[in-house]
Curated annotation (Swiss-Prot):
The keyword Transferase applies. It is an enzyme of class 2 (transferase). The gene is cmoA. Catalyzes the conversion of S-adenosyl-L-methionine (SAM) to carboxy-S-adenosyl-L-methionine (Cx-SAM). GO terms for molecular function: carboxyl- or carbamoyltransferase activity; S-adenosyl-L-methionine binding. Residues 12-24 have a biased composition (Basic and acidic residues). Homodimer. It catalyses: prephenate + S-adenosyl-L-methionine = carboxy-S-adenosyl-L-methionine + 3-phenylpyruvate + H2O. Keywords: S-adenosyl-L-methionine, Transferase. Residues 1-11 have a biased composition (Polar residues). This is Carboxy-S-adenosyl-L-methionine synthase. S-adenosyl-L-methionine binds at residues 59, 84-86, 109-110, 137-138, 152, 219.
């Protein structure tokens, strides 16, 4: 079997349009007469890489650090889950960095458009660790033999009543010594802090080329489907699920990521 230390060299792009420069997001550049709720449809999937880079501060840092965390936490002969995988950025980052042998990544999303493009994106790169891309509701996935689970800006789109249930399932499916990475947009009890970080995020999007119209229309579409929680709420849920350790490891404005650890020695 090939040496895992050479995997980063093996995870190289094939000739594929999925590895090309992302298409620029201009979905909301013109006024939309009737704004519905946000959906991850074909139009969004087409511009998603550009959209998320220009909308989520620190996104590229989180993605690269997820790879480093995978190198540390992924155990031999285990499974890794990317729940709400979108186009597979976190999956690819983990696959580039996994050194343990006998592993498989299971990437799950409920958007047909995202899943189709994710499969093409994953297939555009060669690597040793196999990836299964699954179109499904993440609540219906039975997590087994997991050493690492990623929820990268996914939980906030789940009905609040189902969030504890999902975290319980993640904890039960993790091996001892396993890790969950939970990235989210945060809300804040302190109104002044929340308003400051909201405005800084607004400035970030403006600096990345979004107009006031684009920012406003996208926010209107998201407000009923992306419901954010405070860091304290996330920690309480994680502890209730059984995680012995949970802490924020990255934050930029009102976006950040927590890591939650299941106690015990890695197997």
């Amino acid at each position: 079997m090939p040496n895992r230390d050479t995997q980063s060299q093996n995870d190289t792009p094939r000739h594929s349009p999925e590895a090309a420069e992302p298409q620029r997001d201009s979905l909301f550049a013109a006024p939309i007469a009737k704004l519905g709720d946000w959906t991850f449809d074909e139009k969004v999937a087409e511009v998603f890489p550009d959209m998320i880079q220009r909308s989520v501060p620190g996104y590229s840092n989180i993605i690269s650090m997820i790879g480093m965390l995978a190198e540390r936490f992924v155990q031999p002969n285990s499974q890794i889950y990317d729940l709400g995988c979108s186009l597979g950025a976190a999956t690819l980052s983990m696959r580039r960095n996994i050194k343990a042998e006998g592993c498989k990544i299971i990437a799950v999303d409920n958007s047909p458009a995202m899943v189709e493009r994710c499969r093409r994106h994953i297939d555009a790169f060669r690597a040793e660790t196999p990836v299964d891309v699954v179109e499904a509701d993440i609540l219906d996935i039975k997590l087994e033999n997991a050493s690492m689970v990623v929820l990268n800006f996914t939980l906030q789109f789940l009905e609040p009543a189902n969030r504890q249930r999902l975290l319980n399932q993640v904890y039960q499916g993790l091996r001892p010594g396993g890790a969950l990475v939970l990235s989210e947009k945060f809300s804040f009890a302190d109104h002044n802090v929340g308003e400051l970080l909201f405005n800084m995020h607004h400035d970030f999007k403006r600096a990345n080329g979004y107009s006031e119209l684009e920012i406003s229309q996208k926010r209107s579409m998201l407000e009923n489907v992306m419901l954010t929680d405070s860091v304290e709420t996330h920690k309480n849920r994680l502890h209730q699920a059984g995680f012995e350790h949970a802490e924020v490891w990255f934050q930029c404005f009102n976006f950040g990521s927590l890591i939650a650890l299941k106690a015990g020695e890695a197997q």
